[in-house]
Amino acid sequence: MRQKIVAGNWKMNGQIQQVTELVSQIEELIGFDCAAQVAVMPPSIYIPKVRDCLRTGRIVVGAQNVYPKDYGAYTGELSAPMLKDFDCRYVLVGHSERRQFFHEDENFVAQKFHHVKDHGMIPILCVGETLSERENGKTEQIIAQQVLAVSAKGKDCFRDCVVAYEPVWAIGTGKTATPEQAQKIHQFIRDLVGEINDSDAKHLTLIYGGSVNENNAKALFSMPDIDGGLVGGASLNAKQFVEIVKCIN
């Protein structure tokens, strides 16, 4: 059975009082019968504080970024061993904002992906097309390029990882892919991975990240190849985030 996951990406939002209140509220509202693995990804400086606020084990902590070296003269960066020290379970790699604003290319994303795996954490590989790429019929070409970029290390590379489809045109815009549009791409990703390793493809968790909210989550999560969500803005509101989590069957 595939792991169901809902992850909240808080991006560069919140200060210490806000993040501690937010995670405490989420934990209080989440309940004990949650069908999904719930993760929160605060700004890196607050990871230890958020980890220390958790009381029940119903929520895990993740990181928004990592640098693909264990240590060295990389001013301002954080390595996987550092993140693991604070019990991070998941790490985002390849988020569209990192690709766009920090010019991270496929090779660099692949290095991050394998660095995270090598240190026993789970990378969430983010893939997705821009509006112009979609309008020019290049969606599958772009997705394949981004997914296959991490496959150079062999047929087991998609074991113990998550892939998040985040159409760039839907992030922070209020727009979202229809459930059917999202399902089509999720199925394409699973089939693509299946060409490398059929068993891993069947067990691969695929989540959707593109303006997920409490109004569209149930329809999205009902699709056969959508196993959860990567939630941005709505994850900054405890009630909204938990409503999304509860849409997981």
UniProtKB/Swiss-Prot annotation:
MF (Gene Ontology): triose-phosphate isomerase activity
GO BP field: gluconeogenesis; glyceraldehyde-3-phosphate biosynthetic process; glycerol catabolic process; glycolytic process
UniProt keyword annotation of Isomerase present: yes
Record-listed E.C. numbers: 5.3.1.1
One annotated Gene Ontology cellular component of this protein: cytosol
Binding site for substrate: 9-11, 172, 211, 232-233
Biological or metabolic pathway of the protein: Carbohydrate biosynthesis; gluconeogenesis; Carbohydrate degradation; glycolysis; D-glyceraldehyde 3-phosphate from glycerone phosphate: step 1/1
Alphabetically ordered keywords of this record: Cytoplasm, Gluconeogenesis, Glycolysis, Isomerase
Family matches, as Gene3D superfamilies: Aldolase class I (3.20.20.70)
Substrates-to-products reaction catalysed: D-glyceraldehyde 3-phosphate = dihydroxyacetone phosphate
Keyword Cytoplasm belongs to the record: yes
Main location: cytoplasm
Compartment list: Cytoplasm
InterPro entries: Aldolase_TIM, TIM_sf, TrioseP_Isoase_bac/euk, Triosephosphate_isomerase, Triosephosphate_isomerase_AS
Catalytic residues (positions): 95 (electrophile), 166 (proton acceptor)
Pfam families in the cross-refs: TIM (PF00121)
Family, as annotated: Belongs to the triosephosphate isomerase family.
Subunit comment: Homodimer.
Function: Involved in the gluconeogenesis. Catalyzes stereospecifically the conversion of dihydroxyacetone phosphate (DHAP) to D-glyceraldehyde-3-phosphate (G3P).
Protein name: Triosephosphate isomerase
Organism annotation: Legionella pneumophila (strain Corby)
Upper classification of the organism: Bacteria, Pseudomonadati, Pseudomonadota, Gammaproteobacteria, Legionellales
